[in-house]
Amino acid sequence: YRTRHAQYKADPQSRRLHAAHPMIPLWDDHESANNPWVGGAENHQPGREGSWQQRRAAALQAWYEWMPVRDPAPGQNRGDYWRSFAFGDLATLVTLETRHSARAQQIEYGDHPGALASQEAADHFLRDVVGATGRPMLAPAMETLVMDSLAASVRSGQPWRLIGNPIPMARTAAPRLSAADLTRLSSAAPAHELERVARLAERGALGLPLYLDPWDGYPAAREQFYAGARDAGASDLLVLTGDSHSFWANALHDASGSPQGLELGTSGITSPGDFALFGEAGARLLDERLIDSNPEVLWTDGLHNGYLRLRLTPSQAVADYVAVSTVLEQEYGLNRLRRMHITPGSGGLDWEWR
């Protein structure tokens, strides 16, 4: 892990970035292993790779050594990494830790093949397996910090409450794909992606989540988070999200349909977009079907690399979704894909595209 961090930090543009700007970094999964939880990881094999606890400890130690953050307080668990920042009278930002402090093991579709047998089986799977209580995402101490920070922000009259969130929060079912869609995607996708097309079609036909590693795999924990924010007087969250290699603009709601805020998701800097291997036409088709299949998804782009630029003033927020023309050369062009204007409203957040 130290060698890999050193490799990244040797990049001249990474050095310039760290020299020029303060950063508030969050980890997700690949700082340790793919899809970790408190007791292991999807891509950790104890028989060949030893103790998960030792591997995680090494990963987190290297992360603290190489990233621009303070070391934990004496006696504090390195995995208990959550923070709150107040930006004057403008905003509060609270960052979440969703991997190493409380997360229950992910549910895998492959372990429940019967969930795809019928709509009744899929509904049972979502309700009683994925939706089972007692599967936490956040540590209780972190939830206390988050809700106390949100309540303090509301009391002080700050207009904005931001959540630094490693993984997608919105309800995102797999896209519903027609026979014609499948034909188009099968002709556009490389051979190793054809199995993925079939999985998307199966899940989409039954209204099952696109993925179960994000908050969609922990709906009871998500409802608990929303309830805490609501009790703090904060149903106007701006949730800033990474992980998915895609751009997102999502309208968040609790199970009763009450608005909880907006989620702004950024694509990867250099990692391929989630649908990039389907080519431009295939990626656009999948984006359109995701929007059609999900009331919470206002817009998404799974093709481009880039970044999200968010500017806050007391009266409005402006979110620019910026794509880069290439990640293979130092010279590149910028293209603003969408611009969202957001204003505080009486019932949460109002927004429009401009």
Regions found by a protein language model. Give the residues of each.
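Metal-dependent phosphoester/phosphodiester hydrolase catalytic core
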Residues: 1-354
